[in-house]
Amino acid sequence: MTGTIPSNSQDPDLVLSARPSAHGRFGRFGGQYVPETLIPALTELEQAAATAWKDESFTKELTQLLKTYVGRETPLYEATRLTKHYERGTVGPRIWLKREDLNHTGAHKINNALGQALLAIRMGKKRIIAETGAGQHGVATATVCARFGLECIIYMGQEDMRRQSLNVFRMKLLGAKVRPVTAGTATLKDATSEAIRDWVTNVETTHYILGSVAGPHPYPMLVRDFHAVIGEEAKKQCLEAFGRSPDVLLACVGGGSNAMGLFHPFIEDRSVRMIGVEAAGDGVHTGRHAATITEGRIGVLHGAMSLLLQDSNGQVQEAHSISAGLDYPGVGPEHSYLKEIGRAEYAAVTDQEALSALQLLSEKEGIIPALETAHALAFLEKLCPTLSSGKEIVINCSGRGDKDVNTVAEKLKTKN
């Protein structure tokens, strides 16, 4: 969709394009705000992706690896006991989980990491860098680099390394070099900044596997397209399970890749509500949160114009969340666009609400979700009472919670 759509358009007949404008924009969001040294690399990446998607050998190899290496397709699971929990008498929606936690490496992240690794090989780039917050993208990137024999360097904030020590060990075990970032808040924003600095310095030999639908064009489109397999599978599985599209899609949003992967194939179906759930941290009113769409203003971060958490001087504010994967002060530009035109809805839940949701799913379904996923699950408390029987909710279970067990144990110990 080009930038011809007016700001805050609520046109119900709006048809959304699969591609941003020629300048990499979704409405007024997106673009390429990067040093000139990176423009050739971004152009090369966009052209390589466009060529690859038209190449049957590329799509065949990607599809085969997604099946035999990643373990796709992932199930659409009917959460019967969770559904029962939210019933009012016998009234309430039915809840389904799209089980991305069952992918190799335990999250959705490998869909994108695998696709970009194949592109890097096509471009002749043998050195790979990536940023990571919760560690899942770092593990996924280290995994595909091991699979293809590529050099791998992961940038991770020191605070996130403390919170996600298990994933740090996994990355090292897979042969990656994990470089701690101590600048700023020592979290995802700072790790991303360091990765971009590395890329500027080594652009001729290095490909940056960016882990979310953020950053300069073509990354928001590229990452979304590699994750769209989530929604494509879900659409087919919903038809098989209950004969139609779901009424509501629900996914957590930090940068927003798992949500865009689920949402994208449904965007033109106006009968489907799409709800992204951000991290309210200690509460939006406290200032200690990562609710970018809920509270942010337009600005530029990491190469793209989008909604950002900013102070009165336009400086990027620190984000806070119990979830390292949502602890980011920006969001992908397509999410900002979907919010502005009224196609998607966004809400925020607190750390405590996410913890409670993690415990609930664990006890009701025997599935321990990632803290990121738990934010989407927590919104069921507000959503389910508004829906009648016969409504179908699909939640993207974006990752498993093994990595978060220590954090959860500490919080519950403190609480008790």
Curated annotation (Swiss-Prot):
Highest taxon listed in the record's lineage: Bacteria
CDD domains: Trp-synth_B (cd06446)
Keywords linked to the UniProt accession: Amino-acid biosynthesis, Aromatic amino acid biosynthesis, Lyase, Pyridoxal phosphate, Tryptophan biosynthesis
Known cofactor(s): pyridoxal 5'-phosphate
Swiss-Prot/TrEMBL catalytic activity: (1S,2R)-1-C-(indol-3-yl)glycerol 3-phosphate + L-serine = D-glyceraldehyde 3-phosphate + L-tryptophan + H2O
EC numbers for this chain: 4.2.1.20
Pathway: Amino-acid biosynthesis; L-tryptophan biosynthesis; L-tryptophan from chorismate: step 5/5
Pfam families: PALP (PF00291)
Location of N6-(pyridoxal phosphate)lysine modifications: K109
GO cellular component terms attached to this protein's record: cytoplasm
Enzyme class: lyase
Bilayer-spanning residue ranges: none
Any one GO MF annotation of this record: tryptophan synthase activity
Subunit structure: Tetramer of two alpha and two beta chains.
Purpose of the protein: The beta subunit is responsible for the synthesis of L-tryptophan from indole and L-serine.
PANTHER family: TRYPTOPHAN SYNTHASE (PTHR48077:SF3), TRYPTOPHAN SYNTHASE-RELATED (PTHR48077)
Family as reported in the entry's similarity comment: Belongs to the TrpB family.
Record's protein name: Tryptophan synthase beta chain
Organism field: Prochlorococcus marinus (strain SARG / CCMP1375 / SS120)
Gene: trpB
